[in-house]
């Protein structure tokens, strides 16, 4: 009986240690954007990855919030406020910003609501000083280096992987960095499932399923189901961290085959009103256009 009591006490002690360790490992929440970005400081990334940073700076990931102000504004003002009569909370805002600015996961409730209000101001009060000031702050929020290489790196199978380690850089190879930072190999980063966390069906923390776009659906149900094997990264990371898509003319040329057949002919106008000479041949043509979708999903899609 004494041994059983000791084992029970030891088990409880170990559980308390684990709970305590988990509590200590939980990252703090930021009360300002400055504090938030300091927690996930990416300024040193460009020192070693200058070319990658330059590519990313020209990508839509770099402006993922300010380029989507209209949609997020409508979610807050029309969806939450009018249709669902639901207050703006961090949990609700994350239904947009968990993808458009994953660092918001580490914002306090107060800061998250302030950011939501900034989005409304930036879109609603166009050309005003308040809108300009809000946009300047919102432009600092995006899908940056640590969004993919840390925050979302373990989310494909979080129940198995657990949350990303603070300060760890996850990459497809896990290369040594000569002490620049800790690196851990993650096979998830080269799988389509990684991209589909956001470019597909999103599962919110409250259980709501959100289908902002149908891209992953057509990829899985049409391309993969019919024997396709390429991943999102095979096409959209081919040029590096520009992540080109439908906005890039070279990517469009690669993804869409275009053939045009023109058959010229002549015809008589017949006895139509306004025809001066019904025996004068009229030059005409039949134009047939063939469009071939070479991508792994519907085009257009989003």
Identify the role of each PLM range.
Residues 9-20:
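Bacterial N-terminal signal peptides
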